Amino acid sequence: MKYRHSFHAGNFADVHKHIALLALLRALKKKGKGFLYLETHAGRGSYDLSGHPAEAAGGVGRFLEAQHEAPELREYAAVIAALRARTARRHLYPGSPLVAAAELRAQDRAVLIELQGAEAHALEQSLSTLADARAGGLPVRVERGDGFLRLKAFLPPPERRGLTFVDPPYEETQQDFRQVTAALVEATRRFPTGVLAAWYPIKDERTIGPWQSECLRALRAALASPPAVLASELWLYPRDSRVALNGSGLLIVNPPWLTLERMQVWLPELQASLTTSADAGSSTRMLSESDR
């Protein structure tokens, strides 16, 4: 499976991951001390949806048409509207780097890693547009390289607070799953108190449970005190279909206080805003000892 950010921009998986990302960032901002936001596979930062691609129409398009009760959903819609206004691009869809950059305070900073040169250049352009509208610019650094390999260079951060976001393209699905597992272990070993979120595609349900169990085993083997791990999943199609992307998953290591409880509120509401299909569903739970 290949999940390239530009091809799938604005689809249901993006909406899921970006709402969760925004909620995690705002949880970190509840304390005054600064933090590092580190992203391993940043992409180009923003996408033009003026052609109304089908995936975006069924994702962020449908989301923005709905009325929302959960604050997390309303806040995400407001972030999109604000970024479109600040950049004067009415069809802009902000990727995770722009969502994060717009949230940073003066005491926070971000390191965004991107392997592809053209994508990294486009990311710098996206950020410069945003920086022009902010006094003092953005505390953001773009690094060109392999995010899996470069991750360890930035952890632990001197701030001792941070969020690492791992979102590879899954061009080589099984290899990327293995690399995500290794990244989870490496990042948590270097920065045991840091928050880490890793996105994964749900295509063949039979592979997800064993992979989650392997992540837990690897964390337990590497760390004297294994961290709490939350799994959040949203699917719009039968989980065992092998035709296309069926669902979106996030593993969150060291989830901030109330992340589980709040996600159990807003994720079902998000699902209902995107589809009424009986095949759809959502789940948010802590991975437990029995899952190992």
Where are these regions (language model features)?
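Class I S-adenosyl-L-methionine-dependent methyltransferase catalytic core
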Residues: 1-292
